[in-house]
Amino acid sequence: MAYIESNSGKWEYVIGLEIHAQISSKSKLFSGSGTTFAASPNSQVSYVDAAMPGMLPVLNEYCVHQAIKTGLGLKAKVNKYSVFDRKNYFYADLPQGYQISQFYYPIVQDGTMEIPTSTGELKTIRINRLHLEQDAGKSMHDQSPHYSFIDLNRAGIGLMEIVTEPDISSPDEAAEFVKKLRSLLRYVGSCDGDMEKGSMRCDANVSVRRKGEPLGTRCEIKNINSIRNIVRAIEFEAKRQVDLIENGESVIQETRLFNADSGETRTMRSKEEAADYRYFPDPDLLPVILSDELINELKASLPELPDQKIDKYITKFGLSKYDAEVIVADESAAKYFEEAANECDPKLLANWLINELFGQLNKASAEISECKITPNDFAKLIKLIEDNTISGKIAKTVFEIMFETGKAADKIVEEQGLVQVSDSNVLNTVIDEVIRENPDSVEGYKGGKDKLFGFFVGQVMKKTGGKANPGLVNQLLKEKLGS
């Protein structure tokens, strides 16, 4: 467990998260309007979205199905009876004067998700609920020095709000939870998890306490838009609360905003309670009643989920838990790996994927879907290493050319004459030359300077242009030098 260190001792973090995940649907939750990102302002707005008098909402069945599938992925209870409520508050980008949400009877509740901790152990985070609600519009304050404008394109888009219990004990655990949840949503297909575009947003409820003491007063930090900022916002807020308490002041329950430039939180408004929103069932929408048949059908349609894939990669492919988790975290990377793993050694493949391919993709700020190397061609590169056609060092050169050009490994090796030298007669000739040219080093090695062995290997590799089989060079050198 992580602690906040202060002059008076250690304090514990107590953190709960609320994740707003935009449902990957072509139409909104209660209207047929489109949901295309970055469309022209107010180009995807129906009379329902604009709250014109007499316009009634019609529930999008696809959004309901996506919420059910997400709930099943979270090992949660899917409620056969759920109700939409009106959450009443005024804001300029909320044309109805209320938000349609689910307060009393959510569609999903009582789920769990396991996350890795700093000790390497798994920790279970309880999911209190997942409910459906509509998004608000967007206020635009940078278009004019005199006016604010409203874009209702986002108004009415379906959201899943996923609420955890306060089981998270450090900023890093919060980040791990969000990363794992995002991965799950992408596998299920219910949300693309793109925090930069706002399709996944995070609110953090943060309080502090001494070990064994009751829960402290919490503050909610709104709309954190990146994994890194989740960590920064929680760290700052917890430290702020500790400083207040140690100076004899009280923490006020409130909603705060995080400023990514300053790394600080600031007051947004006093924290509302449920009574402030005057929730009541929406009279324009019937309760959602689900059948066992539908729930079972959606359960059967779920793909292999991240935890299942990790187990498979460890048992079937022999990967380490770390390697399996790194690959499975990205669904596209997992598909790439599985396609290539049928053609070569999976463990060597995983090593090259993580250390070489992912590294190059990060440098290029590219996704694996943009990679010019096909899974089949990547597998062929691994096979060339496996059968000693090329050395690992040469393979890195070949890989870099493949990454830039998309050319097949065997063609690059053939065109540039990079085939590894594994002929003992040829290598013995080179080794004899090296020994003849370096009598002092030979004498030093035989006199006990073992580190000189690396010098001889380097000389052989230099004379062969790095093409000599390093394993065979080591073996032959030991025979020649009598070690």
UniProtKB/Swiss-Prot annotation:
Gene3D superfamilies attached to this UniProt entry: 1.10.10.410, GatB domain, N-terminal subdomain
InterPro entries, per the entry: Asn/Gln-tRNA_amidoTrfase_suB/E (IPR017959), Asn/Gln-tRNA_Trfase_suB/E_cat (IPR006075), Asn/Gln_amidotransferase (IPR018027), Asn/Gln_tRNA_amidoTrase-B-like (IPR003789), GatB (IPR004413), GatB_C_1 (IPR042114), GatB_Yqey_C_2 (IPR023168), Gln-tRNA_amidoTrfase_suB_CS (IPR017958)
SUPFAM superfamilies: GatB/YqeY motif, Glutamine synthetase/guanido kinase
Keyword Ligase: yes
GO biological process assignments: glutaminyl-tRNAGln biosynthesis via transamidation; translation
Reactions this protein catalyses: L-glutamyl-tRNA(Gln) + L-glutamine + ATP + H2O = L-glutaminyl-tRNA(Gln) + L-glutamate + ADP + phosphate + H(+); L-aspartyl-tRNA(Asn) + L-glutamine + ATP + H2O = L-asparaginyl-tRNA(Asn) + L-glutamate + ADP + phosphate + 2 H(+)
Record's keyword annotation contains ATP-binding: yes
Keywords: ATP-binding, Ligase, Nucleotide-binding, Protein biosynthesis
E.C. number: 6.3.5.-
Family listed: Belongs to the GatB/GatE family. GatB subfamily.
Function: Allows the formation of correctly charged Asn-tRNA(Asn) or Gln-tRNA(Gln) through the transamidation of misacylated Asp-tRNA(Asn) or Glu-tRNA(Gln) in organisms which lack either or both of asparaginyl-tRNA or glutaminyl-tRNA synthetases. The reaction takes place in the presence of glutamine and ATP through an activated phospho-Asp-tRNA(Asn) or phospho-Glu-tRNA(Gln).
UniProt xrefs under PANTHER family: GLUTAMYL-TRNA GLN AMIDOTRANSFERASE SUBUNIT B MITOCHONDRIAL AND PROKARYOTIC PET112-RELATED, GLUTAMYL-TRNA(GLN) AMIDOTRANSFERASE SUBUNIT B, MITOCHONDRIAL
Subunit structure comment from the entry: Heterotrimer of A, B and C subunits.
Designated name of the protein: Aspartyl/glutamyl-tRNA(Asn/Gln) amidotransferase subunit B
